[in-house]
Amino acid sequence: MKIFRSAIVLFIFVGTSPAFAGTEITAQNVSVLNPQRFEFAVESGYLFGAINAPASYEIGAEFLTARVRWGVMQDDSWLRGYNQFYVSAIAEPIFRGIENHYFGLNLGMRYNLVRPGSRFVPYFSGGLGLGWIDSHPEIPGGQGQDFTFNILSAAGVSYRVDEHWKINVGALYQHLSNGGQTNPNPSLNLFGPQVGASYSF
């Protein structure tokens, strides 16, 4: 968790430091603080089990995400930015672990920190959702049932290629649990890098 917090601080520093201001955005482009309203993103991550994992886990995290801009903070401080509400479809092959795959949905909010004239936009996000895993409760440490809840948290930096396209890199945390509906409930905590690309319109 300390590593995750440190990553958030680093990403905020990178995006707000003058040394990382990037190429100035021309007047013809859409304002960074008032971007186009809708956005679709494809993102991939590679997650590792941590924090009392019941077994050694390595998971490929694939996300198809729709976002809509919702609220802008007009401020001269480093908090200047805008919100996005998002819905993500999740597909995760489990390369190492007791189970084989996970499918789910996640709903949440993302906040983007922006500076005038910068193409770099630090962000952080969090959401809740539900999904299904091919559980194996007969195996010690296996998930107790197919239905699970999920929690996602992420922090990273987007780079604005043009008025429509952005690429991003960041860190992702995922928690899977059935909320105590089975006993035992060997939940999963997963951390790892994430990259993606998005299109705004």
Each model region followed by its residue ranges:
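Outer-membrane beta-barrel "beta-signal"
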Residues: 64-66, 188-201
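Cleavable N-terminal export/targeting peptides
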Residues: 1-33
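Transmembrane beta-barrel strands of outer-membrane/channel proteins
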Residues: 38-48, 85-91, 124-130, 169-173
